[in-house]
Amino acid sequence: MKMRCLVLSLLAATSIASFAQTATGLSPKWEELTGPDFITAIHQSQGVCILPFGIIEKHGPHLPLGTDLINVRYATEHAAAAEYAVIFPAYYFGQIAEAKHEPGTVSYSMHMQLDLLQETTDEMGRNGCKKIIIVNGHGGNEDLLPYFAQSQLQTPHDYVVYIYRWHGNYPGRPAEHSKIDMHAGESETAHTMVARPDLVHQDRAAQESGADQARLHLPQDVYTGIWWYARFPNHYSGDGSVATLELGQSDMKAYVGDLADTIRAIKADQTSLQLQNEFFEESKHPLDTKQ
């Protein structure tokens, strides 16, 4: 079984690299390009660059710490094989304070997260990435990244930041068997069975509980940072033991297709940067803005 998983993983990695390079003659991966090839790649991608955003955190007792990074890069690399874009190297400097009690979690300060992401997108922009798609592979970033995108209006930029998060809603999706599936559960385990089957230890998935402990009783409209720990102290939500390869393959195919379509749409978008420039110009003289 382990040998079969290793073979599947190696075949998947080989297919990504060969498909991407056959379609364009260039690797989509920033770190694999030479300096001269990087210039060609930026032109080939029409200035569209992707920042797949993962995290390092516990994923139940059965999935690797880098699950979010592994899966988001798998989807991004396959999408870039279908619609060429330059992919930034591994990035996992996001919000994961709620898992600091678990082994292996790497949690950076709020200021570090925002400063590093700003410096990274600035450097991407300086290198010709005028349309930067941050592909979010981690649920803990769902508030961080829209805020970051909104904060780009504070200072003029010659690039646009787009945030993409695939939510898995599509016709014909195989039925799930779990009532709760929020972290390291059925769907995420299924996705990793496709991206890195050799790192999935499904036989261990039932060693810890992924049930909602419901230890906090507050009004529905109240938010507090300890909510996740109150519900899922094992940092596990759902049941990875019921995951199937069928679900993983179906989801990943839909994910890759939707992301490839998104890359095409952003390549065609000429309005966002135009309006952003207009906004920056008007913001210099707000009293002159027509009322």
Model-found features: residue ranges?
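Extended, histidine- and acidic-residue-enriched regions that form the cofactor-binding/catalytic faces
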Residues: 21-111, 115-131, 139-291
